[in-house]
Amino acid sequence: MFIVSLSYTAPLSDIDALLDQHIVWLQQGYAAGLLLASGRKSPRTGGVILARGERAELEALLARDPFAVANVARYEITEFHASMSAPELDCLRNI
């Protein structure tokens, strides 16, 4: 499993102009089975994505994000192996 931390590198007006395209891109990632969860950081300085699959697949997906194409965000990918969880999140183990 991967934790992706997005940090905006442009004003929010630039982010907002691409937001609808970014949401479509997220929907495609969920449909492909790569994305598990996503959302904004608070304060609104970027976002966080939980993903699964192979790192190369994830990197290719991230490269197609409209935020990446427009160079308005940077991405930090952390691979994570959940060894313990709350019972309601057991499904995240062994991903």
PLM region spans:
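Conserved, structured core segments of small domains
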Residues: 1-95
